[in-house]
Amino acid sequence: MNVGIIGAMEPEVKILREAMQNPQTLTKAGFTFYTGELAGNTVTLVQSGIGKVASTIATTLLIDNFAPDCVINTGSAGGFDPSLNVGDVVISSEVRHHDVDVTAFGYEIGQVPQMPAGFAAHPKLVAAAEQTIAQISDVKTLVGLICTGDIFMCDPIRIEKARSDFPTMLAVEMEGASIAQTCHTLNTPFVVIRSMSDIAGKESPQSFEEYLETASINSSKMVVALLEKLTAVSL
């Protein structure tokens, strides 16, 4: 399978990049794409940068230039479910924007006009990710809603509003929904797999930086194991 992998920050892509065999690089619009073999698949890896605009551009370039069969977004997130701890993993069943509000025109909270309210991850990718993580790790793994916004969620007022708007949200981050929206538009299956670097309402920039490496190691490990399983999956 031809798989595209996107991570926002250097620690989130470094481990995967170093594990690739016969890597080749291509730079487009300031983004460096690494193509090679990883766990029995052809893989193209890119560090998108942080936020929705950067990740949208990176995803568009990835799909347009490399035509992956699917896209995996990996990296860290802030946990919203109270049962989650640092290092635990959330797999997206659906991804939504938490910082979009066009409800004045009849749209759902988080819904971009002319787009679905949420973007569903491909069920085969979700199932494969869930099975993989259960086999290789004893960390808690939840499957459900991940929300995205251009906000580092450490303000209690913003956190409570997000909880009110999206009561089933398991985790929050800054790229997944824009990647998902781009994949939806360009008809490419996707899944988001995030390891918790902090827990919303408890985190600070210091705690995020402290646990980012742990989250990056965990998420990279999950992606490699998922790639091994994808050799037998047909989308």
UniProtKB/Swiss-Prot annotation:
GO CC term (a single one): cytosol
GO molecular function (one): methylthioadenosine nucleosidase activity
InterPro entries for the chain: MTA_SAH_Nsdase, Nucleoside_phosphorylase_d, Nucleoside_phosphorylase_sf
Recorded metabolic or biological pathway in which this protein acts: Amino-acid biosynthesis; L-methionine biosynthesis via salvage pathway; S-methyl-5-thio-alpha-D-ribose 1-phosphate from S-methyl-5'-thioadenosine (hydrolase route): step 1/2
Enzyme class: hydrolase
This protein's record includes keyword Mitochondrion: no
Active site as annotated: E12, D198
Signal sequence annotation: none
Gene3D superfamilies: Nucleoside phosphorylase domain
EC number(s) from the headed UniProt entry: 3.2.2.9
Keywords tagged on the record: Amino-acid biosynthesis, Hydrolase, Methionine biosynthesis
Annotated binding of substrate, by residue: G78, M153, M174, E175
Catalytic reaction(s) noted: S-adenosyl-L-homocysteine + H2O = S-(5-deoxy-D-ribos-5-yl)-L-homocysteine + adenine; S-methyl-5'-thioadenosine + H2O = 5-(methylsulfanyl)-D-ribose + adenine; 5'-deoxyadenosine + H2O = 5-deoxy-D-ribose + adenine
A biological process term (GO) from this entry: L-methionine salvage from methylthioadenosine
Coiled coil: none
Free-text function comment from the UniProt entry: Catalyzes the irreversible cleavage of the glycosidic bond in both 5'-methylthioadenosine (MTA) and S-adenosylhomocysteine (SAH/AdoHcy) to adenine and the corresponding thioribose, 5'-methylthioribose and S-ribosylhomocysteine, respectively. Also cleaves 5'-deoxyadenosine, a toxic by-product of radical S-adenosylmethionine (SAM) enzymes, into 5-deoxyribose and adenine.
Family named by the database record: Belongs to the PNP/UDP phosphorylase family. MtnN subfamily.
HAMAP family: Salvage_MtnN
The name this protein goes by in its record: 5'-methylthioadenosine/S-adenosylhomocysteine nucleosidase
Species of the source: Pseudoalteromonas translucida (strain TAC 125)
